[in-house]
Every structure is written in C-alpha cells, then in structure tokens.
Amino acid sequence: FSFEFILSVTGILLILGLVFASSQLDKTGQHIWVQTIFLVLIRLYIFLFSVMSKLGTLGIILDNGWEAPSRSVIKTRGSRKMKGLFVLTLLFLLAQSGMAVFDLATLEVNDQIKLVAHRGYVAKGVENSLEALEAAAKEKASYVEMDILLTKDNQFVVMHDYNLKRLAGIDKKVQDMNFDEVVGLPIKQGEFTSRIPSFEEFVQRAKELDMKLLVELKPHGKEPDNYAELFINEMRRLGVATEYKTMSLDLSIMEEIESKAPEIQTGYVIPLQFGNFSLSNVDFFVIEDFSFNDSLVIQAQSEGKEVFVWTINDPDLISKYLYKSIAAIISDRPDIIEREKQYEEKDNSYFDKLYRLIYN
C-alpha cells in the first residue's frame, strides 16, 4: 500500500510538472510535437505505474514464502532479459508515438452532432408545449423531441403521459377521450402553464420557427391495426415526412413505418442495451448514457445507421459526448450544450487536453 501511495504521489507531481512544462513550451496548445511528447510520456507513466504496481504485489508474495531463483540463474539470464526489455520498451514508445499522433489528430469536437431539445426547452415552459418549442428555437436547437398519442377517435395530440393527471389534473387516459376533449386542455408544470396542442398545431408552429421535430410515438395498446399508416398519412399530409424523424420504444411499429414509408427516418429507443445491437430495420438507435460504448457506434455506422444518446444534462457528460462520433445528443438543457461546445472549441490548454484524454 505504501509503495503504491508513494508511486501515485510521485506520478501526480510528475504529471503536473509535465503539464506545466508543456504549457510553457506551447502556450497555444497546438504544436504537434509537444503534444505528441506530452501524450507519450503520460501513457508511459500509466504503463510503468501498472508494471511497478504488479511488481510490488509480486514482491509481497515472494516475501511471504515463495522461493526466489538462485543468484547464478538470475545472473546468466539477466543480460538477455535486459536486451529484450530494451527492445520491448523501444517498440512500446514507437507504438505510443503513433497512437498519440492519431489521437491528437482525431480528438476534436464533433461539429456534426445535432442538438435535440427533449420535449422542448422545459426550463422555459411546460414540456411538449408551444412555449417550450419556442424557447428551444431561441436556443438554436437542431431538433425538438416531442411525444404524440392517439385519441379515441384516431387523431394525434402532443402529450407524453398516457394519463392526464400529472399535467392536466384530470384522471383520464388520452386513449379513452376524443380529440376535441383533449386539445386545448390547460396544463401546468412548476411555474408554467399552457394547453395541450394537436400534432398539426405543433407542426405548424415548428414550421414558422424553422424548427425540425423528432417525433416519438407513444402507443398505448388500443391503437387500430392501421396505426402506422395513420401516422404515415399524417406526416405526408403535413408535408414533413422527409424532414422530420420519428422514434419509438416499439420496434415493430418503427420497422413497419420504415417498410411502408422509407422516406421517414425511423429510430428505435432502447432503455437498456446489453451487448451489440440486434438486427433492426431502422435508421438510428437511441440509447441512454449507461448503455453507451464506442463499439456500439462502430457497429451502427458499419450498418449505415446512427446513434443518438439521451437524456444528457450534466455538463461533464455533454463535454464527453461532444467528442464522440454520435449523431445527436438529446437533452433538457440545450443552453448548456451550446455553451459547452463553444468552450471545448476554444480551450486547448494542456490541463484541458489531459482531462479530455482521461475522461474520454
């Protein structure tokens, strides 16, 4: 324990000294050779720390009763081992140098990432309301994610919950009410008030704001057999089939829409993903932070699909995902994402680089 503690403290001091020296030599943080040496030395320390820790553990085991090799055996084998160790160290440094150049060249903010405001900008209005839509547009979100339910008379309204009690104070389900009974009902969330809009009304306002929508279908189980066709027809009637994206927890509905209306971009929302993605006829996957790993992005891209991540609100997590090859970040805080993006593009000190390399 004391050995690793001393090694850790020494390493921290060395890393801080390296960061300081690199910052003095390259104040802009853009000199490729200084960056390469910086990264190689950091990785070399991590490698040596791992080796020394294992050697320390081995030493404790030997002290507790293992019989060490004789002095003559050690002497005859020593020179060959030292040569081999030298060659391996040299190869390691060369490999790390190449990897460092590659990492530094690719460790850039992904400027293609779409910012998706989750149910609008909910810090400025009731979720899924026109006010939340308008607030998200002011924050220059790429898309607004919103939820739609089918009423008893087979029309679409904008609402997340199956039951209206949480927002409207009415203990009734949307599936048991007609369109005219739902649209216009007052809703309240925190200090904000609004009313339930129809899907068409929401789309028309989004068009006025030049805001694209990510439409989540929320099937409640009592939809007619032609549910997918009802949605497709509505998207086409409103003239947004090729502009908007849609997603759902129900894979079968998404695959039906993909089959019947390939012009509509479809996504499968996966609450918890273990292992690789299963074979799915959709255009993108939507996963939460816990399930995310880089191999999933590689798999999706190899299949010509995209990956969206939800719901990312923590600034550190937002910063992390800005460097990933994902298509979109879904967040309740579009204001934070834009701020973090500007910060990451601007700040390139060696402390920033060290943090990104460790955290990403």
Segments the model singles out, each with a brief description of its role:
Residues 112-116, 143, 212-214, 243-246, ...:
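Structural preference for beta-strand elements that scaffold enzyme active sites
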Residues 3-98:
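Juxtamembrane transition segments at transmembrane-helix termini in multipass membrane proteins
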Residues 160-265, 287, 301-303, 357-359:
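Metal-dependent phosphodiesterase/phospholipase catalytic core, i.e.
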Residues 103-152:
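Membrane-interface segments at or immediately adjacent to transmembrane helices
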Residues 125-135, 199-202, 226-228, 268-278, ...:
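Short, acidic/polar
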Residues 68-124, 170, 180-194, 353, ...:
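Long, acidic (Asp/Glu-rich), low-complexity accessory segments flanking structured domains
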Residues 267-360:
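C-terminal active-site rim and adjoining tail of enzyme catalytic domains
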